[in-house]
A protein has these predicted regions:
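A short helix-loop-beta-strand connector motif used in the catalytic cores of GNAT acetyltransferases and
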Residues: 1-2, 55-57, 82, 150-162
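A conserved beta-strand-loop-helix scaffold within acyl/acetyltransferase catalytic domains
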Residues: 14-20, 129-194
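Conserved active-site tyrosine of GNAT-family acetyltransferases
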Residues: 72-74, 236-242
Length: 256
């Protein structure tokens, strides 16, 4: 893990060469942002200045979903890709309402509730998005993504969603939806430089039946780190004791 810092901020990050090739500039994945002086608040301009001074044009940020202050600042930097990655534990879900953001809420487990409806969730903005201040980078990323999609999908099946910035109504990001489609999963995996593992949908599976299928992929030998839109299926993963990350992408967040 690398660090960049000045007299105000410290950013811990991992460098990703794959995205350098995609975007034509230095790209990092931010793991943590710390204030040098804890009395101060995290300021948008301070963060932007530190990244710019180090030649970073694109940053992916992994932030606990409950850290709303940092997310508020990061959302103002609308040319950065903003991601929340939260590790969920079954005992947390059973004991309290767990919020992932303004559109995402997991309600407590109720005794006698069927495991297929343990979680009641509302997702309005879900997918993978990229934000740019520079629309040339925007176009370059979209073209790269189209090339990848051509390998897996017919053109008519492309599910590209153009999102609009709520402030100025300019198109600032693209997204692809419905990761449960296998071909889309393969395309997404190549785009992100990650491994795609096909896991069957929950359906009427029990935990034991799910574990049997997971074993076919050798997944019990490694941590699962996949985006899951079907949260009841995520619950079964947790009951099996598999390490698991639930990922959502937040496109716009406003603090009232």
């Amino acid at each position: 893990m690398d660090k960049i810092k000045n007299n105000k901020l410290i950013i811990e990050f991992d460098h990703t060469k794959y995205d350098d090739d995609l975007l034509g500039g230095k790209t990092i994945r931010i793991n943590e942002i710390s204030l040098v002086n804890k009395i101060n608040n995290l300021q948008e301009n301070d963060l932007k200045q530190l990244l710019n001074n180090n030649g970073i044009v694109f940053a992916q940020y992994r932030i606990p979903a409950t850290d709303l202050k940092k997310r508020k600042v990061l959302n103002k930097l609308n040319f950065y890709y903003i991601s929340t990655v939260t590790e969920l534990k079954l005992e947390d879900i059973q004991s309290k309402t767990f919020s992932l953001g303004e559109n995402v809420e997991i309600k407590p487990f109720e005794k006698g509730m069927d495991e297929s409806i343990i979680m009641d969730i509302a997702l309005n903005n879900f997918g993978h998005g990229v934000f740019y201040e520079d629309h040339n980078l925007q176009d370059k990323a979209v073209e790269r993504f189209k090339i990848i999609l051509e390998k897996y999908l017919d053109k008519d099946d492309w599910k590209i969603v153009l999102l609009k910035n709520l402030a100025d109504d300019k198109i600032v990001s693209w997204a692809i939806w419905h990761w449960e489609d296998e071909n889309l999963g393969l395309a997404r995996a190549e785009l992100l430089g990650t491994k795609f593992v096909k896991i069957p949908r929950l359906g009427t599976y029990t935990a034991n039946a799910m574990f049997t299928d997971i074993k076919k992929h050798g997944a019990e030998k490694c941590d699962l780190n996949i985006t899951i839109t079907n949260l009841p299926m995520a619950t079964i993963y947790m009951r099996l004791g598999l390490k698991f990350k639930y990922s959502t992408e937040i496109y716009h967040y406003s603090m009232n």
